[in-house]
């Protein structure tokens, strides 16, 4: 099971999300995801995510998180498994809305669905645990 931490808003005296704090938070959950780690920060939104990955489906670096959609509109840090992710991927290809796939992670498929159908409609198509 992957691990994720982050924060939103708060009082940042220097106006920036502190990367060192996110790193320390991430270090506390290293056992949750020993395969890779990633940090994403957006100072303008005052939000930061850190992710510790336990690679299950896509063992390559293409499944690295936090992950940004190909549209660059969305960022996700996610834990779970979408059992029907290949069917969702096939549906995106069928309607000619699929991005250029970087790998085979269900996270990438979720992001592509979010870009096409929105979050609520994409989640309603998913079977799994997340």
Task: Enumerate the language-model features and the residues they cover.
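N-terminus-centric sequence/structural signature that marks the extreme N-terminus
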Residues: 1-130
